[in-house]
Amino acid sequence: IEYPDKSTNTDKYLSVKYSVPEELAGYFLKKFGDNETEEMFEAFNKDKSTYIRCNTKKTDIAGLTAALEAEGVMVTNEGIDKRIDYALKISGYDYLGGLKSFRDGLFFVQDISSMLASQGGFIKRDAYVIDVCAAPGGKSINAALMADIGHVSSRDISGRKVSLIKENAERLGIDNITYKVWDAVKKDEESVEKADVLICDLPCSGLGIIGRKPDIKYNVTYEKIKELALLQRKILSTVWEYVKKDGILIYSTCTVTPEENAENTEWLVNNYPFELIGKPEQIMPQDGTGDGFYIARLKRTE
C-alpha cells in the first residue's frame, strides 16, 4: 500500500494506515496530537485480552484458578491493576460457554478498566446502590458482590437489556439485585435521596473499545459525540438527586473524548452539589492492558 505523505497530510495518512474514517482521524489529531493519536490507533489493532471477575460468593481466586487450569485454560494475573485482587486474565479456551466453571457461575467476563469504576472502597457492605444504565450488568454484579449485605437496583431502558442483566446475575447466584425497566432521562421520584452509591456508566461514543468492536469507528462523527455528551448531561441532570447527602456518584464511560468525559464532569460540579473525590481517571487504550475508559467519583455535598 502506498500511504499519503505523513508530514503534509497526517489525517489521510492515519486514515489509510489504520482504516479509520478521515473525519475521526482529524478529530483525534485535534484533541490528542500526532504521537498520541498514532499510539492509540496502534493499540486498537492489537489483540485484546479477556479478563474475568471472580464470583467471590462461590469461590476465591485460588479456587477459580484451579478450576480453570483443570479445564486447560491458561490463567495469569499479569498486568492487572494492583487495586484489583479478584480478577484474572484468561486465554487458550475455545468457547466460554463450554467451560464448566463458567456455567457454574464461578466468574463473569468484565474488562479490567470497567472493574476499576467500582474501586476505592466507596461501596460498603451494606450499601444501597442504584445503577441507572446497567446492561449487560457487570458493574451491577460487581457492586452486588461488594455490597453483599446491601442491595443493588439495576435498571436499563428495555426489557431485553434488563433480562440480560438478570440472566448474568442468576447464573452467578446473586440474589441482592432488583431489576427495573426504566428510561434514565425520566425522573424516578421513589429513588430521590435513596442511593449511597449511584453508578452512571452512561451511553457514549465507545471510542475506548474500538479494539474490541472495530465497527464503532465507522459510526462516530463529531456531531454524534456532541449529541451523546448532551444526552449524558440530560441523564445526569435527572439522576443526581438519587444520591443521598454525602453519598457517591460514579460517572464512567468507555470513551476518550473530552466532551463526554472531563467536560461533563466539570459541568456536573459547576451545576450541582457535588465535589470530586481525587482526580478523574482517563485510561487510554495504549496505557497498558485494559480498554479506553473514564472514571470520575464525586461526593454529594448538600
For each feature predicted by the language model, list its residue ranges.
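S-adenosylmethionine
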Residues: I1-E302
